């Protein structure tokens, strides 16, 4: 069983957490414990490493940050449960594809187990959907066998800024959030519930 430290970072600027992820990943050793970071960000658009500027329709003065994760542009804001995975994927016997599958399946399991919601994936469009509306976005980076970045689960937030972009590069993609189904949706609970499901899947795969 893998020892994974959880860190609840609270509300943090995206750029600060991004820099911290880079530093953690570049300085870790084979003995460094894996970590999962739980965080919430002030309003920000983040652009993937191959992101196309035309997918940002109108930023409405929301900051735009270029990152090195996979995927296109997405939005982070208050009320969104963000979970970052700082893992040694070789030690966890994970390839890139298996890591993505585990991240996605943990979200599907969580929504089913705790909220009785039947979520699904769409081939070729990473993320988690309910009735073809996207509830969770993911973007990961693996560098020298170490992962960082993660998943963002729309929980109880203002979804309006998603209309300012083509989310994940898809024009007209409809977004949803847990609060559409459960008014009292709470990001702290979602982060803990998700992490429990993820760690269970991870340990079962080792």
UniProtKB/Swiss-Prot annotation:
It catalyses: octanoyl-[ACP] + L-lysyl-[protein] = N(6)-octanoyl-L-lysyl-[protein] + holo-[ACP] + H(+). PROSITE patterns: BPL_LPL_CATALYTIC (PS51733), LIPB (PS01313). This is Octanoyltransferase. In the reaction, the free carboxyl group of octanoic acid is attached via an amide linkage to the epsilon-amino group of a specific lysine residue of lipoyl domains of lipoate-dependent enzymes. Pathway: Protein modification; protein lipoylation via endogenous pathway; protein N(6)-(lipoyl)lysine from octanoyl-[acyl-carrier-protein]: step 1/2. It comes from Francisella tularensis subsp. holarctica (strain LVS). SUPFAM superfamilies: Class II aaRS and biotin synthetases (SSF55681). Pfam families: LplA-B_cat. Residues 30-206 form the BPL/LPL catalytic domain. The keyword Cytoplasm applies. InterPro entries: aa-tRNA-synth_II/BPL/LPL, BPL_LPL_catalytic, Octanoyltransferase, Octanoyltransferase_CS. The record marks 134 as: Lowers pKa of active site Cys. The active site is at residue 168.
């Amino acid at each position: 069983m893998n020892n994974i430290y959880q860190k609840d970072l609270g509300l943090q600027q995206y750029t600060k957490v991004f820099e911290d992820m880079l530093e953690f990943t570049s300085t870790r050793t084979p003995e460094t414990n894996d970590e999962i970071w739980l965080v919430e960000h002030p309003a920000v658009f983040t652009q993937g490493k191959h992101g196309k500027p035309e997918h940002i329709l109108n930023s409405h003065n929301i900051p735009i940050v270029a990152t090195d994760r996979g995927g296109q542009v997405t939005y982070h804001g208050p009320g969104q449960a963000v979970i970052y995975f700082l893992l040694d994927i070789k030690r966890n016997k994970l390839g890139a594809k298996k890591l993505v599958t585990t991240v996605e399946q943990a979200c599907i399991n969580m929504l089913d187990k705790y909220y009785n919601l039947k979520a699904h994936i769409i081939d070729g469009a990473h993320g988690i959907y309910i009735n073809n509306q996207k509830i969770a976005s993911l973007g990961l980076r693996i560098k020298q066998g170490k992962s960082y970045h993660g998943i963002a689960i729309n929980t109880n937030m203002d979804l309006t800024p998603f209309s300012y972009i083509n989310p994940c590069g898809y024009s007209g993609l409809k977004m949803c959030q847990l609060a559409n189904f459960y008014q009292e949706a709470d990001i702290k609970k979602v982060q803990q519930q998700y992490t429990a499901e993820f760690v269970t899947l991870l340990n079962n795969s080792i």
